[in-house]
Amino acid sequence: MIPMQFALRRRMIIAGGGGAPISDLPLGTLIRILYSDGGKGVADYEIADINNLVSGGVVLVRKNIHSNSAFGSTDSYPNGTLDNLINTTIYNNMPQKLRDKMMDVTFGLLTVSGIEDITRKMFALTRTMAGFGGSEGKALQLYTSDASRVKTFNGSASNWRLSSQHIADGGVWVVQTDGSATNYSSSSSYGVVPAFVIPSETPYDPTPNTDGSYNLIL
């Protein structure tokens, strides 16, 4: 059997050297993003969804935690601390060519008044996207078990924030170190895990990096 990277390279050559589309890769594949990241300069994002949350789009979710942050001064995500960090600060640190590729994503957030839609280029996952049910977008295809949701910060499993309010008990949803979810105060500091969507035909270089990740061709 021909190894995947050689089969993909052959496809790229046949296609004229433009790279294979990212949607050819399986869920969980790591995509390396080169950007200003706390001095490290790179971070891996995992393919979490293909042509599901957004038709014609691939959802990339940071493999591990970017930093820690409060949710905000209230339990409402739009324009709060977490939203502004992801949609402004982290977004602005992405390469311009990648920002140009990012698709607008519209999804609903449950409030005490019902579902309210927001549109973002970069965002924190909702509880629905993370696989905990509800009606805030769609469940991403990768997150089908607690184990699939575990994320680390500085090498240790750590809690990370979702964008959803916990209407029944107050506070906001947080994914715990074992991949389950519960509610915590919006003022507490927990992990930041950004996500974004790019077109499914976006090409990538089929030669993997040493950690098994792949680079986009932008």
Language-model segments: which ranges?
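N-terminal low-complexity, intrinsically disordered "leader/linker" segments enriched in small/polar
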Residues: 1-18
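Collagenous Gly-X-Y triple-helix signature in extracellular proteins
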Residues: 16-218
